[in-house]
Amino acid sequence: MQKIMHISVLLSPVLWGLIFGVSSNSIQIGGLFPRGADQEYSAFRVGMVQFSTSEFRLTPHIDNLEVANSFAVTNAFCSQFSRGVYAIFGFYDKKSVNTITSFCGTLHVSFITPSFPTDGTHPFVIQMRPDLKGALLSLIEYYQWDKFAYLYDSDRGLSTLQAVLDSAAEKKWQVTAINVGNINNDKKDEMYRSLFQDLELKKERRVILDCERDKVNDIVDQVITIGKHVKGYHYIIANLGFTDGDLLKIQFGGANVSGFQIVDYDDSLVSKFIERWSTLEEKEYPGAHTTTIKYTSALTYYAVQVMTEAFRNLRKQRIEISRRGNAGDCLANPAVPWGQGVEIERALKQVQVEGLSGNIKFDQNGKRINYTINIMELKTNGPRKIGYWSEVDKMVVTLTELPSGNDTSGLENKTVVVTTILESPYVMMKKNHEMLEGNERYEGYCVDLAAEIAKHCGFKYKLTIAGDGKYGARDADTKIWNGMVGELVYGKADIAIAPLTITLVREEVIDFSKPFMSLGISIMIKKPQKSKPGVFSFLYPLAYEIWMCIVFAYIGVSVVLFLVSRFSPYEWHTEEFEDGRETQSSESTNEFGIFNSLWFSLGAFMRQGCDISPRSLSGRIVGGVWWFFTLIIISSYTANLAAFLTVERMVSPIESAEDLSKQTEIAYGTLDSGSTKEFFRRSKIAVFDKMWTYMRSAEPSVFVRTTAEGVARVRKSKGKYAYLLESTMNEYIEQRKPCDTMKVGGNLDSKGYGIATPKGSSLGTPVNLAVLKLSEQGVLDKLKNKWWYDKGECGAKDSGSKEKTSALSLSNVAGVFYILVGGLGLAMLVALIEFCYKSRAEAKRMKVAKNAQNINPSSSQNSQNFATYKEGYNVYGIESVKI
């Protein structure tokens, strides 16, 4: 039977006209459809077949037109009337409603319409659409709104707006009414964004959208674009097709969205219709072959049933209806009404049936009565009925326990979309990823973390990579979010597990879990070459100033020792010969001449002994304090010498952010879209503000699209570029080959990575609890060690330091050898000079002695012997210096 019905539906209205046009059982019905109402027309055709009877058939005459064009509507209506139609089904808008109602009242032609209800009394107009005013006012009172914006489409009439304004005046509501019906389609997106930005300035976060589906979708798109669909905003969609719009894109934003639904999909009658509706071929019936139907299409479908029931009732009452001879000119003056039109109007108003939109019944004015409208709210798991409104009961809330934001029911049967970003070591493609599918293609810290979170929360998930490869920032001009944050905000993903920094601007549009990793902004530079120790690196343990002070102290001590030795009588003594006899000379000697004082001080400083020592108390005091001084200096020097000689040092040109800000030779930048750039842009600290001023004006640009690009730029810059990034990533890259980058200085700030979910998502609390549990169990630390250090390619931090400090190279002590060789050479040179000097002096002495011998040969021998001994003693023994 269903197959036969399906085949019969495919018969075109033209064929019906040819077959039944001359039959007395054929009832001509007019149809005025606006262009683009494909689904409504398909529902009309299906109703024509579905509700046809053996007693008679409805034969349609269809015109497609612009309902906003009164001239086109007039021509079409008159054309239908002249064809002898019994009733007309059609649509109108604000511009054509008066034309149609005027013709209907004048010509007595009934007009059945699913368009918006009109105010006042219009005979011969049958309103299929229930009035929404009562339900809307009840919902406003239920939410206790006293201040809100009302966006209305003037093409739908102003009756609902007037009712709201009347109630506002009575109850002292503050209503901002804005007409969006006249917005230019070419600039509608820009104008919608501007409109909501103006509302934001007025703190208007409660908005009623009194528009049809297409305009609501356009507005919602721009609301999402500028991020006004998050927690803290509440929208009421004031039409009867809450589920008709594309709710998926706003479902996970966090904003409260409420509305009204006339088609109850839980009703068995609706379910049966949808089952048949979904089997129709869309090519033959545009808009069909779906599991949903627009409320205007549902009203159209049951308008056919209303007409069928009306004519059936007339047949039962044996009232003969005929247009033979009554097909006149609608523009005749005076107009000639159809005599039997009153009977048809009465029959239509008396119809009472159960349809897709509930109980269908009309009052004497052709308006719907005894109807029920479902009250809907949008939750993260889809639209949910919270109650209903009727003329008798008014608003009744049936959902006594609203689902909390922590409700995870339904997740078991849903695959959660996890957005992330390719960033080592958080998420990486496996080497053989081309041979794998799904989540198995990825590896990394966040991949393991996602598996742990899913295990604790009990849901299935699918990893997806952010389309633009960015973390998420809002464009300053368009206010559009990009990256992973954008995918959460615009409903493309359910959760983001990635190195996503928790920031204030992001927290305004998405929810974050507790941090799963703490970090801060750090500086990455190219690792400088290890500095080779200098020839005189043994001097490094003490500063240049200390060495100079030691030299001056050495000279000063030697001079003081020389002086006190000269002034102290206890430092002088007489010379003795080897046989113990006292010398015949009355002169006393002093061992501490200037050169011996220098020699004593040098020997004490070098921790070596000396053949002479002070005899006087004053001299010994000088020697004692000098020994104490040298003890401390030499001990300190020795303590530092090992470190300076054995450890290879790397001299970094930059040690902190202050160093970067004070120079321009080394460029520095951040990721072009991320929290690091936002930190510098918003910072009020002088150093960071100065760095931001440089970065935003630098040419070429110092910003990079990805972290990999930033690292490559550091490595290729030969030390002329520094990259500012999170410390965790900096530490990881430092452990990867070619091991040529390093982190310098401390962290510039303190922050954390968190798992992000859309505002108000049911995943928020379970994910947060899972992170805390993993932290307490030490799983997060194990994951970090696994991906940072266990898989490192540059060795553990400070590994091998003991081996490197245990051996010295020749370059470490080359200076000591140079001094030794220099000292030996100097000694040889001094010895040569002494030899030459002595030889020359001896030659002169021998010459003088020979001349003296010639003059006094008798006494020359003894004098010569004594002089020779005395002179030799003075030269090679203890010198005697007179002052």
Curated annotation (Swiss-Prot):
GO CC terms of this entry: AMPA glutamate receptor complex; plasma membrane; postsynaptic density membrane
Disulfide bond residue pairs: 78-330, 739-794
Family annotation (InterPro entries): ANF_lig-bd_rcpt, Glu/Gly-bd, Iono_Glu_rcpt_met, Ionotropic_Glu_rcpt, Iontro_rcpt_C, Peripla_BP_I
Residue ranges crossing the lipid bilayer per the database entry: 544-564, 617-637, 813-833
Catalytic activity: Ca(2+)(in) = Ca(2+)(out); Na(+)(in) = Na(+)(out)
Residue positions the entry lists as glycosylated: 256, 370, 406, 413
Residues engaged in binding L-glutamate: 499, 501, 506, 675-676, 726
Intramembrane feature spans: 592-607, 608-610
CDD domains hit by this protein: PBP1_iGluR_AMPA_GluR2 (cd06389), PBP2_iGluR_AMPA (cd13715)
Extracellular side: 25-543, 638-812
Region (Required for interaction with IQSEC1): 867-877
Positions of post-translational Phosphotyrosine modification: 876
One of the GO BP terms on file: ionotropic glutamate receptor signaling pathway
SUPFAM superfamilies: Periplasmic binding protein-like I, Periplasmic binding protein-like II, Voltage-gated potassium channels
Domain notes: The M4 transmembrane segment mediates tetramerization and is required for cell surface expression.
Name of the protein described by the UniProt record: Glutamate receptor 2
Species this protein is from: Pongo abelii
Gene assigned in the entry: GRIA2
